[in-house]
Every structure is written in C-alpha cells, then in structure tokens.
C-alpha cells in the first residue's frame, strides 16, 4: 500500500508540472499576439515599432588624400546620404539613409541636387551638415544595409546559407565541410559562412552570393582559395568554373579550409578605395590578418612589422572613436597587443622595446600629412598607408612560383613572380630585388594547363607577340599560376573574356613528347640523337642548316589543332624534293616548338628540365638550324667573308645569322662562290673551324628575331636523310647533299614567302624578357674551356687533342664499306625508330625512374662512331634537392652562374675556340646576376631523361685493341665512358668534352706536361664477361688536373646520386694476377643490378701517380705509425674525395717518381721495417698470417683505406649488400715505403665502381671476423693505432656553450622570421643531441662497453653475407659515437675547411649507411611521436638556419666566419641526430624515409655552403663571393624547408 501511495503522489506531481508548463506557454502566445495587434493598430509613435527621428549636426573635414568628405548624396529629392566611404571623414558620423536637413547654413528644402553637389565641391576646409536619423534604421552590419537586405530577399541566389551543425558528435574545427553538402567559407573579417551546394553548384555561384551578402561591387578582385591547414603560406586558388562537389571530393582538400579572399591585389589600393570602399576595407582586414599570421615573414623586416603594428593601432583608435591620447598600456590591457604584433616579434623582443618602437612610429605616422594641414590623419589614410607599405613586399602584391622554363635550347629553373605590378616576371636576384619582366597580361591570348604526371603539370602561356611560354610546375602551383594569370587578365584587360577555361573532366592526351608527332623544339628521336648539348659542339652551329624555314608568327600562334596537317606531314619525313619540304614546313602547325626542349647539359640543374625525350633528329639541332634565315636567290651567288659589302648585306638582310663568339670568318673558306662555297663555309670542318664563325647580327639586332628562331620544325619538313647527314656533318663527315646540289636556287622563290619577319614586340615584353634569353644564348655558345675552369688550356695539349679528335673524326666518316650511303643510313634509322618509343620523364618526389626500350643493334653498328657519348646512361635520383647552387666556374665565368641543382653536370664538349668569355658578359651584363629562389619557397620538380641499357648493348666498343681509351683534359672531368665497364658501372657518367664528336673516344690519352699520349687497351669490351684490365708498364695512365680547380670549390652532388671516380690505377701486364698482385674475385663480388663486375690486377712494383693540381702531392716527411696524436702531413691534403672533382682519382700512390717530378720520392731508410709493419698491422686486424697485403700500398694506406672499407668507411648508396673478398696469397710482397697518405675514399659518394676500379683493393674480412673492429675493448692496441688514421677532423668544434646567454639583437639585415635565433639558450640547443634526450625513443642507446671511441664512418660495416641495417648490433655502437665525435672533435684553424670537408664526408657516410628499418613505436602512439618529432625537428632546423645567417654577415673576419661555420656544423650534426631518433610504425614509415632523403639533401647543400664560405675567406668579401655565399645560404634554407615541410604540412595520420 505504501508503494502504491508513493506512485500516486509522483503521478500527481507530474501532472501538476505539465499543467504549469502549458499555462506558461499559453500566456506567452497570448502576449505575443496582443503585442502584434497593438503594433498594427496602435499610433505611429509606438516605441515598439516606430522609428525615432533624431537630429544630428556634424562638422566634416575635407580629406586631403581623397579630396572629398567621404559620403555620397542622392541624385533625387529629398536629399539623403546614399553611401559613406569607409575610413573617410564621414565614417562613423553619417550613415546611409540619413536625410539631409541643412548644409553650410543652407536649408535642404531650398537646395536642388545640383546645388548640393556644388556645395560639396566648393567647400574647401570644413563642411557643416545637419541630418535627421531614425535610431532603429542603423544597420546591424556595417556591410549589409536594409535596402541591400530587401534586394536580397527579392532576388534569391542559388547558394543558401546553412546553420553550423555538429556531425557525428564532433565539432567542425577547421574542416572544409560542415556536413556532406555544406561548404564552410571563412571571411577575412572574422565571419564564417556555410553554403549548401548542389551537384551543379560552381565556385562562381558562391562568390556571387558572398558578393551580395557583403555588398561588394568590385568582385573581380576576389576568389575562393583553399588554405592548407598546417601550412598557411600555401594557398591554392579555385577556378570559378570548378564544381564545388569536385573540389570537396579531392583528397588534398580534406585538410584545407576555404577562404574568401582578395586574391588579385590592385596595383594601387587608392584606386580600389575610390572604386569600392567595401572591397577596400575587406582588403585591409585581410592584410592585417595576413601580417599577424606571418604570411610575409620571410620577406618582412622587423622595422616594417613594427610600423605596421603602429598603423594598425592608430587605425583602430580612429575607427572606434577613441581619444587620441590613448596609452599603450590601455591598448595592451583592453585590446591585447597580440592583436597587432606577430608572435615572432612578441617572442623575440622585449615588451619595453616594442612599446618604445610603436610610440616612435605612431608619432612618425602623423607626418604623413602636409605640415600646413591642421586636422588629424584619417582612418582611411592610415589604412591606405598600411597597404602601401605592404605593397613593397613581393609576396604581398604577387605570388612566387618556382618553375622550369622551357627555352629554345635548354630548360632553365627560374623563380616566377606574378602580380599586378610585375605581370609575369622572373626573379633574377631576390636579395637585390632584380626582376625581369617576361610578359604583360595585355599580351596574353590564352593559357593552357595540361597534366604531365600525377604531381607535375605544364602551363602554356600563349602570347600575342612571341609565341608561347611553357612552364613546368607542381600540379597545385600550375593551377594557381593559370588561375592567377586569368584573374589578372580579367581585372586589367578584359572583364568579359577569360584566357583560361577550366575543364576538370578533360584528361591530357599528350606529354612533353607524344606519339602523334608532337615535337620538341630542339630534340631528336633517332638513334643518332645527341643527349649532350648538340649546339655546343664545334660544328653543329655551322653545319646543321636544315631545310626548314622560320614561319611567320601568325602561324606560330595557332594551337596545335588549329590548322590541318598535310598528308606529307602525317606520312613522315619526306624523302625527295625540297618542294614537299616547303609545303610541310609551311603547314606545320605545332605551336609548342620553342617551349619543349631536350635536356641541357650545360646548366647542370636538377631543378630544371635536365632531359626530355627527343622527338626527331632534325629537330635535334633546330636551335642551330633556326638561326639560319635564307633569303633571295642573290644570296647564293657568293659570300666573301672578307668583303665589307657582303658582310653588310648579311647584317642588314638577316638572311644568315649564327650565334657564336667567333668574330673572324674561317680563312679556309674565303673567296668561294656559288652554292658550293656556301656549303663549304657553312659546313666545313677541321681543327681550326671554331675560329671562323659568323657574328650574331640577327640576335643583336632584334629580340623578336630571337623568338622567331624558336619556330618548331616538323618531322615531316625535312628529308629522311637530313638527320643522319646532319649528324655526319656535325661529326666531321662529308657535307650534306643539300649543300652540294645548289638547292637554294630551286627553293628561293618559295622561301621568300615564309621569311616575313614580324614586328617588334611591345615594350612590355621588350623590357626584360631578353635577360634569360640572352643568358641562354651565351650559355649555349660558351666554350667549355672557359666554363670548366679559370685557367687556359695548355696549347700543346690542345693541339694534341685537336689532332686526336681530327683523326677520330676521319676514322668515323666511314664506319663500314657502305657507311656513307644515305639510303642505307636512312633504312637503319627507320628500323631504329620502329623499335624506339618516345616518352618524356619528369621526376618529382612522387615519381619513379623510367627505363627506355632498347635500341636496334643494327643501327648501333652503323652509328656508334657517330654518336658514342650521346647514349650515356643517365641515372637520376629519387629525392631531388630543391635548390642547390653550382659552384662551378666561379673564377673564370661569373656571367654564367645561376641557381641550379647539380644534376647532370656533364662537361661541355671541348671546342677549339679561344675566344674569351668576356664578350658574353659584354653582350648581356645582367646574366652575371645570380638567380635566387625567394627565401624558403621551393619547387621539387625536376625533369630527367633516364637512359638504361639492361642488355649492355649501349656503348659497344667497335674498335679493337686500343679503341677504349680514357679521355683526358686538364679542365674537364673524366667521361665515365672509357670502357664498357665504366659506361655500365657509373650511375652518373660524366661526359668528356674530349670525346670524338662521332662518338668514338679519342684514340690517344693526352698527358699535358709530357706532351705525349698513352694508348690504353681494353681486352674485355663485353661488360657481362668482365676480366682484369691489362696495360703494360709503359702504359701508365696519368689523369692530370681533373677539374682540380673546380674540385676545390665544388662538390658534384645530385642528392644521393653519386659521382663515380674514373677507374684507373696501377695496371700490370699479363693475363692473370701474379704473386705480387691482389685480385678482386668477380665470382664473389655481389654488385647492384646496374653495376658491372670486374677484376683489377695491380702491379707489385709500379704505381700510378695521379695529379690533381700542383699542390696535391708534395714531398713530406712520414709520420710514425704509433703517433697517437693523429698528426697529418701539412703539405698533403686531408681528403681526396670522389665528390670533389667529378671523376677524380682517389689514390695518389707511387713507388717511383714519374717524369713530371710531382710524386713523392721514397726513402731507402723507410723501407727497412716493412715486414715488421705488415706483421703489426695483421696483428692489429686480427688477420691470418697469410692474409695478402698488396705491395702497392703501404701499411698506413691499408689502415686508412682498406680498413675503412672493412669497418664501413665508405658507403655505397647503390648497392646495399656488396660482398668483396680478396684472395689470400701465402707470400707477402715487398711494401711500398710511402708513409703518410690520405685515406682513399672518405666520401659517401663512392659506388661499387670504386670497389673494383679504385687503386686500393677492398679487403673483406671473413664473416666471423667482420665486426671485430667494432669491439675496441677486445683489441685496444688496434683501436689506438687506427684511431689516428681514421680520426675525424674539423676546425675547432667544441660543445662549450657561451657564458652569456640572451636574446640576440636584430640588425634587420634579414626578414624578422630568420633574424632571431630564438629564446632557447645555447645550453638548450644541446638538448637536441641524441645522447641527451632520454625522453625520446632512442634508436641508438649509449654503449655499455668500453668508452674508447672509434670514429667509425657508418657506411659499409657488414660481413660478406649480412647487409647493414639499423637493427644490426653495430648500429647502436658506432652511430652515436660517430655523431658525438663529429660534433666534439677540435681542429686547428689553418686546416679548418679541409678537415671540415672530411667531417662532412664522414657525416654523409653515416647518413648513407645508417638509415635502415629503425626502432618501432606502437601505432596508437603515432600521434604523440609525430608531434614531438615535428617540434624538435623544426627547432633544430631553426637553429641551423639561424647559425647560417651569422656566416654570411659582412662585418666579420675570416676567423670569425670559420667559427660561425663550426657552429653551423654542430647544429647540422645535431639535426642529423634528431632525425636518427625518429621511430616509426606502419603509418609513418614512408614519411621518415622521405625525411632521410631530405636530410641527405640538406647535408649535400650544406657542403656547398661550406665551400662558398671557404671561397669568401680566401678571396675576401668581394661582391661576387658574398653574392655566391648568400645564394648558397638561400639554397640551404630551401633544403631545410623541404626537410621540415613534410612534418609541417601533414597530420599525424
């Protein structure tokens, strides 16, 4: 019963509550209804609804800047205020809708509209106006008035606002969508709008809706953009024709948010203020937000940021009607100083200094007015001045794109700047603010965007006057560029026309070279095509006058499909008359001829298009061919080069013009009349030909003519034999048939019709478009001897080389009995073409290498003598470096310096021209400017041609006996193609300039001092069947000064692609190894797939002396083995890296001084203890007594070189599991007495080619003894003695932190984002060391064993069966110690840079070998590890960049610079240690692998930075040295940016 009573009472209470709620609801409904009725029936003065009129009398000062009072009146009576200018004098005092009662004591009812307007114009100083205002009529939004709201209701739009909702219980955050069909748009005024979209809703619909909502008139300035959530600097424009559904479905859009921005910044903000005050206010708010978010921090100085903060504060004070004397304390307390100053300034400046600076600038801002002006500055003036200061920044008024510009004869990596003030410009030097205009928006006819690969796209900008600009960019950047150009075109040129139409569903149908006849401007698809710069060959510019004409620009502007292609063109190359050639040439319709190109071998830029697949042999030399313009028949009557009349006729007519440096015509070709004379002059050959060239008259005369030379050459516009004949002409064969048959008489009439030269381009293009173009021409024609080094070639050597090449050319003229028959060659070429597939290959971070099909062996049999080095197998990398600068030719040719990554830095062909390179600089001084990417913004695109010959059919040696020779030049690197083994071993062959143009290498090896040659034989031309190289003792090869001057200044680094040294060494006669020889067993050698096994027989009595400059090998006293101090020879360089000069020989060992007298002499007294030293070494190594010690190497060399290889001294990035064993011979031969030699290959760039081709054999211990060197406690004596030879050396590194720690003073030399080192003291910087971070998961815990530290280089430390990985028990032992040793090893100052180079090589070896599987972390903790890794990596990167800024300061001595370099190296090692600590899981392993590659790029780029610092210390602070150092610092900044970008721009997965 009690339970029943309780339930009844609860029921009663519930009913009572329900009744109470119902009563409340009923009362509220009744009261609202009564209120509505009262409002409808009540008097008009009811305060619930009636408008309360209020009279206001205000006095307005005339705005001096705008020359008005900041408001507009209606054109009809009654007089009302229609609009108020934002920031003007009337802003905040008058409002739209105010009815004017009185103006300057004149009643409005007595005024007409015209009279009121006159009063506004005539009043000089102040205007008194009385208005009546309804209090409830003030709009709730400063953007949206009542009348606008009514218009919106009467004119609905397609896109509807939607309320923000929660999806699946999660907050919206910064997501792109509120719900599946609702787009979230962020406005710069702080508002957020959500738009519901349908399947057919476009971006333009949303823009128009926002336009109506915000009452914006000038909507052409606005666009929607996607901002990456974790990288606010990356904004991607959306094309107005894109469907919103497609935008939100993209994978890359998931971590982005949509912004409504002023994406097209006006030239002058004053124009926008007068045109649309609302848009101007929006731009101002957007700019303030960008400054606070530090979008321009890379460019903005500290002083500018503080001045902008002062302007922002003053603008807020005036806009909010605050008292003018407001204190900064009030602002800081009520408003917050963080709303005006960026976080970086707040962190790095004291509050007292900030207040002082802002007060100073606020007083200074009052001076913006004229002195006689009495009124205060207005808010509009403050806003305008704010935007004008920002307009000085390139990143504000424009957007920077790093792209590959495809020019006529090469591709150039450039930094583009696109903006209202700049048009389409190229940044020549960002530090000096040197910009060259490429095109104006008014000259653009259309823009095309085509996809080249998943991550790379091509943008073609068609110009009205100069054909087309073709650019390769990342896909997102390419789309931004196209949208930006189209937007500015619509803004400044034609609002009704769009030059870029979006077709999101259209897929590109072709690549850079396509199957359907899409041709490259200067490429070839035949087997004779030269992959080295054809136009740089001595004869190409004179001989390859093709049967093609420069078409008028009217035809060139047509798109590829605008004009029909004749059947002759589609059918292929014409085989008969010139008439068919002319028809096909005139109807050829490709408009991309001057945009695509073959790879440039002169720039050496991996950031540029290093290679594009060639399309047609005739187009291979179109850069040289197109420079020939054939004129009327009278031209063929004769051309006497010594006749002023004829010279003037050529100059004025522009019929025949050839770009070159030569000024004198060939004396052998003078006084030759008729077509035979022309053929002889244009196609003659001989050792002295390069001295006779025609002046570049057409080029110097008109820039438009230069672009006229970019006409495309159709494959069907030439004779079928022209390719092979042109190639034969280029290589020194007989003149082509068209040169011998007087073809110009037959073609003169038809040629005149297509020779019309276009008019000059407008001044917009004339201003700066030729900077890069002239640079290209200079680069194209620069003699390689000036490019490769500052010193001139030895005349005797040049003469011998010329003779050698001449003989090789003569032998290559007739490769077979019928080799000269055009018909046979044509058939062979057709057969080869049928087996060859054209394709282009673009490599980015997301692409892989592509191998090309094999070529026909039959064609190679006939053409191998013609194009030998043309088919070098170029390999490239998987992790391209963003921007690396080449230090090549810093002394001899500063005019050709350019920001380039050291990609395929093949040596230019050796020419016989001795013309100085100064003429190039006289022709275009601007080319001396270095080109720099704008601070830390970088492109990761490089275009690569990958040539692989899996069947080893490339580069066959067609001559027997001595056909394979090692080319030699005192100024050029070894080609890497001296033998089939060398050609197949090298992943990065260096093409020698001394090779015969026909492809046959020189039959003689030139040695400069002796003025003699040394034939070198090859008994095993087949790479698949390697055997020992045998050369008689008299055949000792000496490679002299292999780019020694470049070796001291440049390190040929292409990411992880290695430069392989030429395989040379002590070679002995005989068919097999003798008792005094060390044979590398090829059966036990496991190399990578692209390597070739070989055996090396070493002579027991003779060694090869390799010269690398006069100071490389000097006589020095030997040091005792037990010298524990580790002193080295002062006169002997500390490192002969394989990376310094490309192809440099790593060993310098001699037992007998050569004839040159540059070798070290041996001492009889030093040879007495050889046997004892051998036994001691074997004891230290714990080797068997019968272990072989080759007689060619002293004990020190074995310890420094061979032991290094045993313990992992060198790294092989190409082969990870290489096994190299040495046969043991019972007898120990006599040792060479040479005592102290630098270790042989301390570079991480060695490849397996070193393993069998280096002078030092690779010793591989038995498996059970392979790791004994990493147990120093078990062999203390061996550890002690070996530590001396392999010790790390770097000038003055120490871990002592400065005593005084504090915030560094900013001198404002750089942007404020980089001029502060940060708040962390130096002691905190050491926290990044791998040994002092116990909280992070250590991959290499401290060793528990002996504290004896051996500075092992973490490279190839593995047994004969097990490859090294981070899981190996060696890794925790030597990696931590190696890094710690690198960071703490002190050195003396004189050898600082040399030893720093060694330490860098040690670090590179560690990086190459250490990155393996690594430790793991649970996937559920990946987010935590990611966040920690990102913060520490960014901190370490910031420290490194901050220390690098101290290196490039001008006000310091060389000693101070060396100290600053030491600090940077410490930070670099610390950064590497941070990366080593990364642990991974299945979710983040890919990102960490990319970090490994990017870290290697950072180290390589830092290597060049150190070289530039060394050059600056040696030469002093000259303008050129400082520019070079600054440019290298920029390259390093870009590399570090790429390292951290993966973490900044991605989430924790």
Swiss-Prot record:
Gene Ontology CC terms: cell cortex; cytoskeleton; cytosol; glutamatergic synapse; plasma membrane; protein-containing complex
One Gene Ontology biological process: light adaption
Ranges for domain PDZ: 57-135
Biased composition range(s): Low complexity: 962-980
Biased amino acid composition, Basic and acidic residues: 1117-1130
Cytoplasm keyword on record: yes
Keyword terms, alphabetized: Cell membrane, Cytoplasm, Membrane
Residue ranges occupied by any FERM domain in the UniProt entry: 181-496
InterPro entries (alphabetical): Band_41_domain, FAK1-like_FERM_C, FERM/acyl-CoA-bd_prot_sf, FERM_2, FERM_central, FERM_domain, FRMPD1/3/4_FERM_C, PDZ
Compartments in which it is found: Cytoplasm, Cytosol; Cell membrane
Region (Disordered): 554-618, 717-738, 775-834, 913-1046, 1097-1174, 1231-1257, 1321-1347
Residues covered by region (Important for interaction with GPSM2): 924-931
Topology in the lipid bilayer: Peripheral membrane protein
Protein origin, superkingdom: Eukaryota
Polar residues bias (residue ranges): 717-730, 950-961
Transmembrane annotation, as ranges: none
Pfam family, one: PDZ
Coiled-coil segments: none
Job of this protein: Stabilizes membrane-bound GPSM1, and thereby promotes its interaction with GNAI1.
Subunit and partners: Interacts with GPSM1. Interacts with GPSM2.
Name listed for the protein in its UniProt record: FERM and PDZ domain-containing protein 1
Gene: Frmpd1
């Amino acid at each position: 019963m009690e339970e029943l009573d309780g339930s009844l009472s609860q029921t009663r209470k519930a009913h009572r509550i329900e009744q109470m709620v119902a009563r409340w609801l009923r009362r509220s409904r009744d009261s609202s209804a009564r209120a509505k009725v009262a409002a409808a029936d009540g008097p008009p003065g009811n305060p619930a609804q009636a408008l309360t009129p209020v009279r206001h009398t205000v006095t307005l000062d005339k705005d001096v800047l705008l020359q008005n009072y900041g408001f507009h009146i209606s054109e009809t009576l009654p007089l009302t205020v229609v609009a108020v200018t934002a920031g003007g004098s009337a802003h905040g005092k008058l409002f739209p809708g105010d009815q004017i009662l009185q103006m300057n004591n004149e009643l409005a009812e007595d005024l007409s509209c015209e009279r009121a307007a006159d009063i506004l114009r005539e009043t000089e100083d102040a205007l008194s106006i009385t208005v009546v205002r309804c209090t409830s009529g003030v709009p709730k939004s400063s953007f949206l008035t009542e009348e606008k709201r009514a218009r919106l209701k009467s004119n609905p739009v397609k896109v509807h606002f939607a309320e923000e909702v929660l999806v699946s219980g999660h907050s919206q955050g910064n997501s792109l969508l509120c719900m599946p069909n609702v787009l979230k748009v962020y406005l710069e005024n702080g508002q957020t709008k959500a738009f519901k979209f349908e399947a057919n809703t476009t971006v333009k619909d949303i823009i128009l809706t926002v336009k109506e909502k915000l009452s914006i008139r000038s909507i052409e300035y606005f666009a929607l953009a996607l901002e990456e959530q974790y990288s606010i600097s990356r904004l991607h424009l959306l094309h107005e024709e894109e469907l919103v559904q497609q935008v939100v479905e993209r994978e890359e859009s998931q971590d982005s948010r949509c912004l409504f921005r002023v994406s097209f910044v006006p030239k002058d903000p004053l124009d926008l203020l007068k045109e649309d005050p609302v848009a101007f206010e929006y731009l101002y708010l957007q700019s303030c937000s960008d400054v606070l978010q530090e979008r321009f921090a890379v460019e903005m100085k500290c002083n500018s940021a503080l001045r902008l903060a002062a302007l922002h504060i003053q603008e807020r004070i005036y806009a909010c009607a605050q008292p003018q004397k407001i204190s900064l304390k009030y602002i800081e307390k009520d408003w917050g100083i963080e709303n005006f100053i960026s976080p970086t300034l707040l962190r790095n400046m004291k509050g007292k200094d900030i207040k002082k600076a802002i007060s100073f600038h606020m007083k200074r801002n009052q001076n913006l007015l004229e002195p006689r002006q009495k009124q205060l500055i207005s808010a509009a003036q403050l806003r305008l001045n704010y935007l004008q200061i920002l307009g000085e920044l390139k990143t504000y008024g424009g957007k920077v794109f790093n792209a590959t510009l495809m020019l006529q004869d090469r591709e150039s990596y450039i930094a583009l700047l696109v903006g209202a003030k700049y048009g389409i410009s190229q940044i020549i030097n960002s530090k000096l603010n040197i910009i060259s205009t490429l095109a104006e928006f008014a000259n653009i006819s259309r823009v095309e965007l085509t996809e080249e690969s998943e991550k790379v796209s091509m943008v073609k900008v068609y110009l009205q006057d100069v054909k087309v600009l073709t650019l390769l960019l990342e896909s997102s950047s390419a789309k931004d560029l196209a949208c930006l150009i189209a937007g500015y075109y619509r803004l400044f040129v034609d609002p009704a026309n769009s030059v870029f139409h979006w077709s999101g569903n259209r897929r590109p149908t072709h690549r850079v070279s396509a199957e359907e006849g899409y041709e490259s401007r200067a490429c070839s698809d035949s087997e004779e095509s030269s992959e080295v710069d054809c136009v740089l060959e001595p004869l190409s510019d004179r001989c390859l006058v093709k049967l093609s004409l420069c078409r008028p620009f009217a035809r060139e502007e047509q798109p590829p499909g605008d004009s029909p292609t004749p059947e002759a063109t589609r059918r292929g190359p014409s085989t008969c008359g010139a008439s068919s050639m002319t028809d096909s040439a005139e109807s050829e319709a490709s408009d991309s001829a001057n945009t695509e190109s073959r790879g440039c071998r002169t720039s050496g830029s991996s950031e540029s298009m290093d290679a594009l697949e060639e399309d047609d042999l005739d187009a291979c030399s179109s850069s040289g061919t197109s420079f020939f313009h054939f004129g009327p028949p009278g031209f063929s009557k004769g051309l006497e080069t010594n006749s002023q009349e004829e010279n003037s006729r050529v100059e004025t007519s522009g019929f025949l013009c050839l770009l070159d440096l030569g000024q004198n015509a060939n004396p052998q070709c003078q006084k030759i009349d008729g077509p035979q004379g022309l053929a002889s002059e244009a196609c003659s050959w001989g050792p002295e030909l390069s001295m006779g060239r025609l002046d570049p008259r057409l080029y110097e005369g008109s820039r438009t003519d230069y672009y006229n030379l970019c006409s495309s050459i159709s494959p069907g516009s030439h004779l079928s034999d022209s390719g092979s004949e042109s190639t034969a002409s280029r290589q020194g064969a007989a003149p082509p048939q068209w040169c011998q048959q007087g073809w110009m008489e037959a073609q003169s009439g038809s040629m005149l019709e297509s020779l019309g030269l276009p008019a000059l381009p407008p001044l917009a293009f004339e201003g700066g478009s030729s900077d890069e173009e002239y640079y290209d021409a200079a680069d194209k024609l620069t003699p390689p001897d000036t490019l490769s080094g500052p010193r001139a070639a030895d005349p005797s050597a040049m003469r011998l080389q010329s003779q050698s090449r001449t003989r090789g050319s003569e032998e290559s003229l007739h490769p077979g009995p019928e080799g000269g028959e055009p018909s046979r060659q044509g058939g062979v070429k057709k057969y080869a073409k049928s087996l060859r597939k054209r394709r282009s290959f673009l490599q980015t971070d997301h692409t892989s290498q592509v191998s090309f099909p094999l070529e026909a062996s039959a064609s190679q049999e006939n053409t191998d003598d013609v194009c030998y080095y043309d088919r070098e197998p170029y390999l490239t990398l998987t992790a391209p470096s963003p921007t690396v600068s080449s230090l090549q030719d810093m002394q001899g040719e500063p005019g050709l310096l350019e920001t380039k990554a050291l990609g395929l830095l093949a040596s230019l062909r050796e020419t016989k021209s001795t013309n100085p390179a100064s003429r190039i600089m006289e022709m275009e001084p601007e080319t001396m400017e270095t080109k720099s990417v704008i601070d830390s913004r970088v492109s990761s695109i490089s275009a690569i041609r990958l040539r692989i010959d899996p069947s080893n059919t490339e580069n066959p040696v067609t001559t027997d006996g001595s056909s394979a020779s090692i080319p030699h030049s005192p100024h050029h690197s070894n080609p890497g193609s001296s033998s089939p083994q060398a050609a197949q071993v090298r992943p990065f062959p260096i093409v020698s300039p001394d090779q015969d143009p026909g492809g046959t290498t020189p039959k003689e090896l030139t040695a400069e001092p002796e003025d003699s040659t040394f034939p070198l034989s090859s008994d095993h031309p087949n790479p698949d069947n390697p055997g020992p190289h045998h050369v008689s003792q008299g055949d000792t090869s000496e490679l002299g000064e292999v780019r020694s001057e470049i070796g001291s200044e440049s390190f040929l680094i292409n990411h992880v692609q290695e430069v392989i040294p030429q395989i040379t060494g002590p070679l002995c006669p005989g068919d097999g190894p003798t008792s005094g020889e060390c044979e590398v067993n090829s059966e036990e050698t496991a190399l990578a797939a692209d390597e070739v096994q070989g055996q090396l027989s070493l002579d027991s009595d003779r060694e090869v002396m390799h010269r690398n400059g006069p100071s490389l090998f000097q006589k020095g006293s030997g040091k005792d083995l037990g010298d524990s101090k580790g002193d080295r020879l002062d006169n002997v360089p500390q490192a002969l890296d394989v990376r310094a000069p490309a192809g440099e020989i790593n060993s310098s060992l001699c037992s007998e001084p050569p004839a040159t007298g540059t070798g070290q002499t041996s001492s009889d007294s030093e040879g007495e203890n050889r046997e004892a030293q051998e036994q001691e070494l074997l004891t230290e190594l714990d080797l068997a007594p019968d272990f072989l010690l080759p007689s060619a190497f002293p004990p020190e060399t074995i310890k420094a070189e061979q032991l290094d290889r045993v313990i992992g001294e060198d790294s092989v990035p190409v082969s990870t599991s290489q096994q190299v064993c040495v046969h043991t011979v019972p007898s120990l031969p006599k040792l060479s007495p040479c005592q102290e030699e630098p270790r042989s290959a301390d570079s991480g760039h060695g490849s397996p080619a070193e393993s069998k081709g280096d002078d030092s054999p690779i010793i591989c211990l038995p498996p059970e003894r392979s790791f004994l060197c990493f147990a120093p406690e078990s062999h203390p004596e061996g550890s002690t003695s070996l530590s001396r030879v392999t010790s790390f050396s770097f000038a003055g590194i120490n871990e002592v932190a400065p005593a005084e720690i504090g915030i560094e003073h900013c001198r404002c030399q750089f942007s404020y984002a980089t001029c502060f080192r940060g708040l962390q003291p130096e002691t905190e910087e050491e926290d990044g060391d791998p040994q002092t971070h116990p909280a992070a998961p250590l991959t290499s815990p401290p060793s528990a064993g002996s504290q004896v530290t051996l500075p092992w280089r973490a490279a190839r430390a593995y047994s004969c069966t097990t490859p090294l990985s981070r899981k190996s028990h060696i890794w925790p032992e030597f990696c931590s110690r190696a890094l710690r040793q690198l960071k703490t090893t002190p050195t003396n100052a004189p050898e600082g840079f040399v030893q720093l180079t060694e330490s860098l090589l040690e670090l590179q070896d560690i990086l190459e070998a250490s990155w393996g599987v690594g430790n793991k972390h649970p996937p559920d903790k990946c987010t935590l590890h990611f966040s920690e890794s990102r913060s520490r990596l960014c901190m370490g990167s910031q420290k490194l960049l901050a220390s690098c800024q101290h290196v490039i300061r001008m006000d310091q001595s060389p000693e101070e610079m060396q100290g600053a370099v030491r600090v940077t190296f410490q930070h670099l090692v610390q950064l590497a240690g941070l990366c080593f600590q990364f642990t991974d899981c299945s979710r983040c392993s890919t990102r960490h692998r990319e970090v490994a590659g990017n870290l290697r790029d950072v180290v390589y780029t830092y290597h060049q930075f150190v070289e530039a610092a060394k050059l600056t210390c040696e030469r002093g602070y000259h303008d050129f040295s400082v520019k070079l150092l600054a440019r290298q610092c920029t390259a390093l900044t870009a590399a570090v940016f790429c390292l951290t970008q993966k973490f900044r721009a991605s989430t924790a997965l």
